[in-house]
Amino acid sequence: MGALCRRLARGASLAAVYGLAFAYGPAVAADEPSAIRLDVHGESRARYESLSGQFRRDFEGDDQAFFLRTLLGAEATAGAFSLGFELQDSRSYLDDAGTPLTNSFVNALDVIQAYVKIKTPSVLGAGSTTDWILGRQTVSIASRRQIERVDFANVIKAYTGLHAITTTPRGDALHLLYVALVDRLPADRESVIENNIVADEEQWNRRFWGVHYRRADALPALLPDVWLEAFVYGVNETDTDETPTPNRRYATPGGRIYRAPARARVDFDIEGSLRYGSRRATSAADDTQDLDVEASQLIARLGYTFDAAWRPRIALQYYWASGDEDPNDDRFDQYERLFGGRRGDLNNTSLHGPLTPANLSAPGVRLDARAKRWDARIHYSAASLASKTDTFVIARLRDPTGAAGSFMGHVIDTRARFWIVPKRLQLELGASAFVFGEFTRDVPGAPEGERTLFGYSQLTAFL
């Protein structure tokens, strides 16, 4: 524990030097009157992470890494037309052969947004408008559980295609989306470790689409400030020599009922979805058998915010994501997390993050608090496999006989953020613990020890 604290202190010092240099560097202004408005935005972030103990298969010992991420973007607008562009530079240092490093952590100097946007009137009523965004872009919709522009992860995922966003004066929103995935390059471990610069490329054989509608204040006579949402998302993949895939062909309909937290009132967030379609067991070229897919996901959270200066809130939560019951049949019933987020609902990610919405049954409780310049939360989950014969996904551990049981373990997750300079410089500290349950201790290939401890210190400077 002392070694972990010393590592975090060193990481905080590195982050401070890096962040201060960015925050107090030259500012870019775009306030001069002009026919063309130029909005410039950016951030530079430094994060040191330390992990004591391992839960992933084939990894052992302690780990650490120092991650840097810099974003710089601009949008030029003339009337109803806009052009947008954003660069991302994501790098890793202090890692070693035992670090589970992939291109989800490193993507040195690449374009994540290059788009044209056109604003037009909409058919959803007086005052409604539609933004038509065409090109390479990042996407977040609603709860971000289906598709998210990640915040905590070191690399932001991009897509290329069309995203139409219709909004109304009363707060309704309609999203229409059809995009191809962008492959983060390089993908080989040696190039990732070296922070090599390789241009990302579109994967035209992997397409993602969606329709998502939100009705604001949908039940005013019954309960004010309740949002109702309905959506359907889909994935279509085909194999190519350059990009082998499991040939996913999914449709995922679902819905959400949501009431935002506010002082002295009850809030809730219930979202569920069903997934139908087919896929193959692997991405191998000789795997040509399609498996039927029928999977489900549900999260339900009920909270209450007390009427106090720092807005303390307590919430109960349950997260379910189905698992595959029989590894030998012609079905695949695991609910895969594809492009949505998991940190906001479950745990810190990056070098840690044992929980993901796939083969999961996890009741939990969380406490939140926030004031003008700081916010904090602590979250506890008692995590089990939804199917004890399916995989503990992040750890890549599986007992197809089910003899190891289903209880993965106890997860405690914390985070605190403080604005050193409001809107310009933010410090974030976090820690997590994963105490192994019977499955994680007894499964074939089980990790050494009985727990993992994780901590990080992060400094972000904003333009």
Which residues does each PLM region occupy?
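N-terminal secretory signal peptides that target proteins for export/translocation
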Residues: 1-9
